[in-house]
Amino acid sequence: MSTLVKLSRTVLAALLFTLLLGPGTPAGAESFDVTNLVTDDQSVNAAPITDPNLTNAWGVSHSSGSPFWVSSNGGGVAVTYSVNPTTNVTSFGPVVVTIPGAGTVTGQTFNSAGSSAFNGDAFLFVSEDGTISGWRGALGTTAETLQVASNANVYKGTTLVMTGGHAYLLAANFRAGSIDVRKGDATAPDLAATFIDPNLPSGYAPFNVQVLGGKVYVTYALQDTLKHDDAPGAGHGFVSAFDAQGNFLGRVATQGTLNSPWGLAIAPASFGTDLAGDLLVGNFGDGTINVFSPDPASPKFLGQLQGGNGSPLDIDGLWALVPGNDGNGGNSSSIFFSAGPGGEMHGLFGVIAPVPEPATGLLLLSGITTGWLTLRRRRRSVT
């Protein structure tokens, strides 16, 4: 066999190796960037915007085109931010809303039922003092009380579910260990079941609840002795799925990498190379983001989002995970987050996006160049 044929095969092998590497990489090897957009203190977390109202940023929601609404648990308000879907340039939204009661607002949700439910309030909020409140434009800068505070209730998260033509607010009651249901109108019937995981170990309670992809997902965290806060730790957590009537569908995630899980989102179609439709579960306990199959009939752990250093991505005090809306609420291909870093003493709002991969053309050029240089060296050695 001639030397030239051998060298041609070397070039071909280099090209084939390049093609096998690109254009994508396995999800576990793909890296993601975190970009801070709003902070309460530049000396703690740098960001383009400083908002002193943002302390322990918690629940996040938006309508189909609205700015982001963010719960400030330590500030007693809900703040709003507009995010350009192309550039992520962020600006203050139109309103800051005072939350009634103690103001310890946690979860929130957009009222997609409109004027037919909850007095027509556009956004609904729950708080750690047991208050449930709502806001609509006519209320100005203060939300109204829909349910007064109670020591029996410590609400950590909330969502809206529509079933049978009626709206229901679901609230994760961490103290009582239940999903509390509030009807949107007086004619709404009771739900068929009560969102109970029959196999949940003692000491765990609902930490958050979200409607995603037609299912109701509930995260569970270990209660502290006062049943007010979570007791973080490796393996401290579960995620279960229910239908809209509260019937248990199955367990999605059991302990493992879970650590006081709270944030929940379905990965957008272009969020990473092969994560589309997977369930993202953010740990408040250690700030990492887990990936699971969303189907309770075939539960599967798929890994964790990776940072640029090859280690799991982690965000101190991570709370919400929410895709954008391609309007005033950022790009729908990105995941936006809230956090209470520094032991919930500070606030942070930002965006998570996959690191762009090298273009296929560049990879091919690299392979061709490698092969050509090899060919030149071999030819020189032959002559």
Across the structure, where does each feature detected by a protein language model lie?
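Bacterial N-terminal signal peptides that target proteins for export
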Residues: 2-12, 375
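Bacterial N-terminal signal peptides
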Residues: 11-23
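Residue-identity detector for glycine
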Residues: 22-24, 28, 361
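Sequence/structural signature of beta-propeller domains
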Residues: 28-354
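A short, hydrophobic C-terminal helix/tail in secreted or cell-surface proteins
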Residues: 357-374
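C-terminal membrane-anchoring or membrane-association module
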Residues: 372-383
